[in-house]
A protein has these predicted regions:
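C-terminal motif of bacterial Sec signal peptides marking the signal peptidase cleavage site
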Residues: 2-4
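Bacterial signal peptide processing site
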Residues: 6-9
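Flexible hinge/capping segments at coil-to-helix
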Residues: 17-23, 114-130
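Short, polar/charged alpha-helical segment
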Residues: 24, 28, 34-68, 72-74, ...
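Short beta-strand->loop
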Residues: 31-35, 128-138, 146, 150, ...
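A bilobed periplasmic-binding-protein/Venus flytrap-type ligand-binding module shared by bacterial periplasmic
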Residues: 44-46, 110-121, 210
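Short beta-strand-to-loop elements that line the ligand-binding cleft
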Residues: 56-65, 82, 154-165
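Pocket-lining segment of extracytoplasmic ligand-binding domains
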Residues: 86-87, 156, 161, 167-210
């Protein structure tokens, strides 16, 4: 995931030209992020903001999909957004550079889970249903790459079922008795494992990628 940063009319070079001795003027900044690990990385900022420990005043918009705030980011109604890297790249091009990538805030949070103990490598995914999220974004591209590099056709050898939220994919895995698997990010991995003792981490996507 990348953090894409946009600017509005108040974020102009005038502020940068002020003398360093001048008093800092607090600004109102709206931050948008996706549910799950993307937003969890902002918990301290959220807490500090509530306790009036931040230099600026922040408001937060947490959504299930980046589409819910991309238009506002381009318009400048949202100043900071955490979203998939491909979405950030698209916005950079659409906005002619007005929206730019400033950092990566999540790494190594994807795992493949099963509830039968039958999956020990990527090849074991062949013929299975895979529940996941992020159609058209980083999770889908990552999954397709891993399958292809292990000789599995993502469109023929497996059935990838995309859900709008990770919690839905977790529920489908927990209720499945057909050997289905799910690719989920933390903290949903921990949540589903705590709720169902049969569910385990079968593959660490980061290690498989490496």
């Amino acid at each position: 995931m990348f953090t894409a940063c946009g600017s509005n009319s108040s974020d102009k070079s005038d502020n940068a030209t002020q003398e360093s001795t001048s008093e800092y003027v607090s600004e109102d900044i709206k931050v948008a992020a996706l549910k799950g690990p993307t937003a969890i990385g902002m918990v301290k900022l959220m807490s500090d903001n509530e306790d009036n420990k931040t230099a600026n005043n922040y408001t937060f918009q947490i959504e299930a999909a980046a589409d819910a705030f991309t238009a506002d980011l381009i318009k400048g109604d949202v100043q900071i957004a955490a979203m998939p890297c491909n979405a950030a790249a698209t916005l950079y091009n659409k906005s002619n550079g007005k929206v730019s990538v400033v950092g990566i805030n999540t790494l190594g949070v994807l795992y493949i889970l099963d509830n039968k103990g039958e999956v020990t490598n990527v090849s074991d995914l062949k013929g299975r249903t895979i529940y996941t999220t992020g159609k058209g974004t980083t999770p889908e591209y990552t999954l397709r790459y891993l399958l292809n590099t292990n000789g599995i056709d993502p469109d023929k050898d497996v059935h990838i079922e995309f859900k709008s939220e990770a919690s839905e994919a977790a529920t489908m895995l927990a209720s499945s008795d057909s050997g289905a698997v799910a690719m989920l990010p933390q903290p949903y991995v921990t949540t589903v494992m705590a709720a169902n003792s049969d569910v385990r981490i079968a593959l660490d996507v980061t290690k498989e990628w490496e």
